[in-house]
A protein has these predicted regions:
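Conserved catalytic-loop aspartate of Hanks-type protein kinases
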Residues: 1-55, 61-73
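Generic detector of multi-pass transmembrane helix bundles and their immediately adjacent loops
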Residues: 50-64, 68-169
Length: 169
């Protein structure tokens, strides 16, 4: 016969078992969701390069250069999040459009920046404020006339970027 004490233990085991099964299924669902979102972003990136930047898409060195930014900043965001001490706000995402803009078009710089920020927003737990702030700063970088050869204009652009961070945060 089953006593009340034994029944409570069995009920507790059942609840724990169901909780573990649910957590495994939900974590698997989340992983599948991230894989789908990442695949969609990468597909959009490849389609954009093929249609709007065919010179970059067809030359392996340029394609590797552009793709390396995605991989590097995604990995950097992952490392910062895993550390638990640092925040993803400390990662200088605005460097990407500055460098890409120096070598390629403004449109390509903005698109790569958007893809990097979206990847980072998948990795980090900071929410939409992080994504909004980084996209806003990327727009300021694209719109500001950053000329790395003219130091005064360069520092004015850096001041605009800093003010955007300060006001939006």
């Amino acid at each position: 016969l089953i006593t009340d004490d034994t029944y409570q233990k069995l009920l507790s085991f059942k609840e724990q078992y169901e909780k573990e099964i649910t957590e495994k299924q939900s974590s698997l669902g989340v992983l599948i969701g991230y894989i789908i979102l990442t695949s969609i972003l990468l597909s959009i990136f490849v389609i954009y390069l093929r249609n709007f930047a065919p010179d970059v898409f067809q030359k392996n060195k340029q394609l590797i250069f552009v793709t390396l930014w995605l991989v590097a900043f995604s990995y950097l965001t992952f490392l910062v999040e895993e550390s638990g001490v640092l925040s993803a706000y400390l990662i200088p995402f605005c460097i990407v459009p500055i460098v890409i803009k120096a070598f390629y078009t403004d449109r390509l710089a903005m698109f790569i920046h958007l893809i990097i920020v979206l990847f980072a927003s998948f990795i980090t737990s900071l929410g939409y404020e992080f994504t909004f702030l980084q996209i806003l700063v990327g727009i300021v970088v694209i719109l500001s006339n950053i000329d790395t050869r003219n130091w005064s204009r360069f520092f004015y652009s850096m001041l605009f970027i800093f003010l955007t961070y300060a006001l939006a945060y």
